[in-house]
Amino acid sequence: MINFEAIIGIEVHVVLNTATKMFSPAPNQAQNATPNQFINAIDLGLPGTMPQVNEQAVQKALILADALNMQRVQPVLVFDRKHYFYQDLPKGFQITQQNFPIAQNGYVEIVENNKAQRIIIERFHLEEDTAKQHFVDGQILLDFNRCGAPLIEVVTAPVIKSAKQSKAYLQKLRQILIVNNISNAKLEDGSMRSDCNVSVRLKGQTAFGTKVEIKNINSLNNVEKAIDLEIARQVKALIKGEPVQQVTLTYDDKTNTNVFMRKKDNSVDYRYFIEPNIMSSNIDELLQKPNKAFNLTEFFTKLKEAGVNEQLNQLVVDDLTLFNAYTKINSVINSPQDTIRWLCIELMGQLNKLQKPLKDKTIDHLIILIQMVQKGTVNQKQAKQLIELMLDNGQDPQSLAKLHNLEQITDEKQLTQIIQQIFKENEGEILKNLDRVERIQKLIIGQVMQRTHNRANPQQVFIIVEKLLHDFSERAS
């Protein structure tokens, strides 16, 4: 790559997590649904149907426009028909925004080698998804649950220079989509799909090389691998003087290779024209609503200031369910460090081990548990035991702590009696070691914890031991 440079542009299709589809009242619930359970005559393009724009989808698009620093937002909503024949497109056309995309001219900021880099976003637009194809025994089976689902297609300028930059951009975009509740943004289930257009040219050359598209990559790590493979292939071809063909590839993670899908043809005429069944509509009212995006940079700064390490910072914005849980818990706990520690490490560690999902009831129970730890009702070891019990039978931590005798002993009178008894039993040992205070403290505290089965509050025990030891020393002298 000494004399060559890569030029990469990325198109990302994002499935919005709205309640209904883009142009119909059908539920937007393609994931884990029975095939063809959520279909509507509008999405199938049956005669006499009239599409209606999903206002929630438009609202999410406006929030994304703020998050991606888009300089131009279209005040009038206009849709076009994109005509082509394929079995997953029952109408024979897709409703999209070719000529008047809802937002243009923005950027996403990434960090590379401790330096901020801007990835230019040319445009993004709203459109509808197609049906999902299943290839079974030589047949193509169609599931129309996904047909008509609301999409946003985000298109970068061809400014990305490496596979590493591509991964960083997609990771940042994904985090933006998650924290703003725009999409679940999971590559593995298709709610975020990226097409990477890769070309290579000699350094100093102004014309672009031949563009090769890589589709259907199911993870961020695989995006990096697929692009690196394609850059290396094109460099090798150019060194040999061989032409690079304009083709579409897909990445096979089992063999770590890019596999040929089809030849690419730029001459396809989609016969775009304005969608006649959707009136152009002014969205000034929607533009006046609060469309302020969540400030991800500020969020990371606050976590860093709270002492949360970068790995955990990234983890909490990696999943919409987890981020929503964090937001709910921290609004009560008001401690990012405690929230992330007990949610991301302790609770999610157990849930992943048990292969159980995170439920609202569990989140409510975790809030109570963290409060119990903060008040000293239970110690950290007891709290971990309570998490296991909570997930086992679904009871709240307060009831479980009483039932299983897992509450800390915090009663000063009770602890003082226990410690005084230990002083009496070890009077000779204490007298011999009055000049070795730490040793005596360790001895007494150890016995207190043993007798209380680790239920005594260590901080309170230490304070009482210190006071009684001081009194004992004065009497002995």
Swiss-Prot record:
Keyword Nucleotide-binding: yes
Keywords: ATP-binding, Ligase, Nucleotide-binding, Protein biosynthesis
Class of enzymatic activity (EC top level): ligase
InterPro entries: Asn/Gln-tRNA_amidoTrfase_suB/E, Asn/Gln-tRNA_Trfase_suB/E_cat, Asn/Gln_amidotransferase, Asn/Gln_tRNA_amidoTrase-B-like, GatB, GatB_Yqey_C_2, Gln-tRNA_amidoTrfase_suB_CS, Gln_synth/guanido_kin_cat_dom
PROSITE patterns reported for this sequence: GATB (PS01234)
GO MF term (any one): ATP binding
Disulphide bonds in the chain: none
Any GO BP annotation: translation
Pfam families registered for this protein in UniProt: GatB_N, GatB_Yqey
EC assignment: 6.3.5.-
UniProt KW Nucleotide-binding keyword: yes
Annotated catalysed reactions: L-glutamyl-tRNA(Gln) + L-glutamine + ATP + H2O = L-glutaminyl-tRNA(Gln) + L-glutamate + ADP + phosphate + H(+); L-aspartyl-tRNA(Asn) + L-glutamine + ATP + H2O = L-asparaginyl-tRNA(Asn) + L-glutamate + ADP + phosphate + 2 H(+)
Alphabetical list of NCBIfam families matching this protein: gatB, PRK05477.1-2
Assembly, per entry: Heterotrimer of A, B and C subunits.
Family, as annotated: Belongs to the GatB/GatE family. GatB subfamily.
Function, in words: Allows the formation of correctly charged Asn-tRNA(Asn) or Gln-tRNA(Gln) through the transamidation of misacylated Asp-tRNA(Asn) or Glu-tRNA(Gln) in organisms which lack either or both of asparaginyl-tRNA or glutaminyl-tRNA synthetases. The reaction takes place in the presence of glutamine and ATP through an activated phospho-Asp-tRNA(Asn) or phospho-Glu-tRNA(Gln).
Protein's name according to its UniProt entry: Aspartyl/glutamyl-tRNA(Asn/Gln) amidotransferase subunit B
UniProt gene name: gatB
